[in-house]
Every structure is written in structure tokens, then in C-alpha cells.
């Protein structure tokens, strides 16, 4: 016996004594619309209707669970990829930070050397120039005295750290 559908399809319904159910495949049961299912269920006993609806619900839930698993795996892979990228960025920034700390230490050393030199020069009194050229030079100014020694001190400390 066939039950004609409003569309072009015809659903086959086997109803033989002792057989509860129809000749629907799982795929057909899951993919058919509610309207098609209701048309298919007409004329079946309540027990058969409940059984078919329960089977359909179970199959649909399996499909939903499978798609959720796929989605979860995809999201996990994406998050792991982002995590790896962020870890690389953290390592890069840590390396930059370490090199900047070294540069800062070198600059501090230069600054301290300059401060020490400035204190030394500031403490020494202005000495009048002596010797045959003294008349042309005048008194020695602390800022001009030993300017090359500052450069030497700073350069030697920087080279020692490199």
C-alpha cells in the first residue's frame, strides 16, 4: 500500500500483521519534514507513532551531537593555533625586553661615569696655567679639562660590558 504525498514522492508504508513499523530508512526519517512525517504516520497505531517519533528524535540528537563534536574539535584546533602564535609573540617580546634591559644598563653605566667625572671636575679648584704658554691660555676651566678622559671612561666601561 502506498500513501501518496502532496509532492511527487510516494512513501511506502508496509503494514503487515505482527510488524510494527514502516520501511523507512534512518536517513529518510531524519531528513523528512514534519509535514511529511505526519502524513506518513496517519493510520499507524499510537504505539508505532511513538516508536517512530522516538527513533527520529534519537537519530536527530545523534546528528546534533556529532556536529557539536566537530565544532568543538575545530574550535579547539583554532584556539591551540592562537595559543602558539601568542606564545611566539611573548617569547619575542621577552627577548626584546632583555635586550632593552642590557641597553638600559649600559646607558646607566655611562650616566654614572659622567656623573662621577662631573663631581671630580667640580671638586678640583681652578688652577692657574703655568709654563711658557700660560700667558696665552689663562686659567683652566673645569668643563674643558680632560674632556677626552670622560670619553675614555665611558667607552672603556661600555666595551667591558659587551
UniProtKB/Swiss-Prot annotation:
Gene3D superfamilies noted in UniProt: 1.20.5.170
N6-acetyllysine carried by residues: 53, 60, 71, 76
Region named Disordered: 1-24
InterPro entries: bZIP, bZIP_Maf, bZIP_sf, TF_DNA-bd_sf, Transcription_factor_Maf_fam
SMART domains associated with the record: BRLZ
Localization per Swiss-Prot or TrEMBL: Nucleus
Cross-link (Glycyl lysine isopeptide (Lys-Gly) (interchain with G-Cter in SUMO2)): 14
Cross-link Glycyl lysine isopeptide (Lys-Gly) (interchain with G-Cter in SUMO) per UniProt, renumbered positions: 14
Record region (Basic motif): 53-76
GO molecular function: DNA binding; DNA-binding transcription activator activity, RNA polymerase II-specific; identical protein binding; RNA polymerase II cis-regulatory region sequence-specific DNA binding
Residue span, bZIP domain: 51-114
Disruption phenotype: Mice, although viable and fertile, exhibit abnormal megakaryocyte proliferation as well as age-dependent behavioral defects. Megakaryocytes display both anti-glycoprotein IIb immunoreactivity and anti-acetylcholinesterase activity.
Residue numbers spanned by region Leucine-zipper: 79-93
GO biological process: adult behavior; in utero embryonic development; positive regulation of gene expression; positive regulation of transcription by RNA polymerase II; regulation of cell population proliferation; regulation of epidermal cell differentiation
Post-translational modification: Sumoylation at Lys-14 is required for active transcriptional repression. Acetylated in erythroid cells by CREB-binding protein (CBP). Acetylation augments the DNA-binding activity of NFE2, but has no effect on binding NFE2.
Modified residues (Phosphoserine): 124
Keywords (A to Z) from UniProt: Acetylation, DNA-binding, Isopeptide bond, Nucleus, Phosphoprotein, Repressor, Transcription, Transcription regulation, Ubl conjugation
Pfam families xref list: bZIP_Maf
Biological role stated in the UniProt entry: Since they lack a putative transactivation domain, the small Mafs behave as transcriptional repressors when they dimerize among themselves. However, they seem to serve as transcriptional activators by dimerizing with other (usually larger) basic-zipper proteins, such as NFE2, NFE2L1 and NFE2L2, and recruiting them to specific DNA-binding sites. Small Maf proteins heterodimerize with Fos and may act as competitive repressors of the NFE2L2 transcription factor. Transcription factor, component of erythroid-specific transcription factor NFE2L2.
Subunit structure: Homodimer or heterodimer. Homodimerization leads to transcriptional repression. Forms high affinity heterodimers with members of the CNC-bZIP family such as NFE2, NFE2L1/NRF1, NFE2L2/NRF2 and NFE2L3/NRF3. Interacts with CREBBP; the interaction leads to acetylation of the basic region of MAFG and stimulation of NFE2 transcriptional activity through increased DNA binding.
Family: Belongs to the bZIP family. Maf subfamily.
Protein name (database record): Transcription factor MafG
Organism: Mus musculus (Mouse)
Gene field: Mafg
Amino acid at each position: 500500500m502506498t500513501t501518496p504525498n502532496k509532492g511527487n514522492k510516494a512513501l511506502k508504508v508496509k503494514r503487515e500483521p505482527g510488524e510494527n513499523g514502516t520501511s523507512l530508512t534512518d536517513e529518510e526519517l531524519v531528513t523528512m519534514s514534519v509535514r511529511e512525517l505526519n502524513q506518513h504516520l496517519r493510520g499507524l497505531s499510537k504505539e508505532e507513532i511513538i516508536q517512530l517519533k522516538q527513533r527520529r528524535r534519537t537519530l536527530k540528537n545523534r546528528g546534533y551531537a556529532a556536529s557539536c563534536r566537530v565544532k568543538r574539535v575545530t574550535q579547539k584546533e583554532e584556539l591551540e593555533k592562537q595559543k602558539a602564535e601568542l606564545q611566539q609573540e611573548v617569547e619575542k617580546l621577552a627577548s626584546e625586553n632583555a635586550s632593552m634591559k642590557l641597553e638600559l644598563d649600559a646607558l646607566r653605566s655611562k650616566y654614572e661615569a659622567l656623573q662621577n667625572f662631573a663631581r671630580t671636575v667640580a671638586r678640583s679648584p681652578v688652577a692657574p696655567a703655568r709654563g711658557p704658554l700660560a700667558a696665552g691660555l689663562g686659567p683652566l676651566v673645569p668643563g674643558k679639562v680632560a674632556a677626552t678622559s670622560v670619553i675614555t671612561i665611558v667607552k672603556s666601561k661600555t666595551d667591558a660590558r659587551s
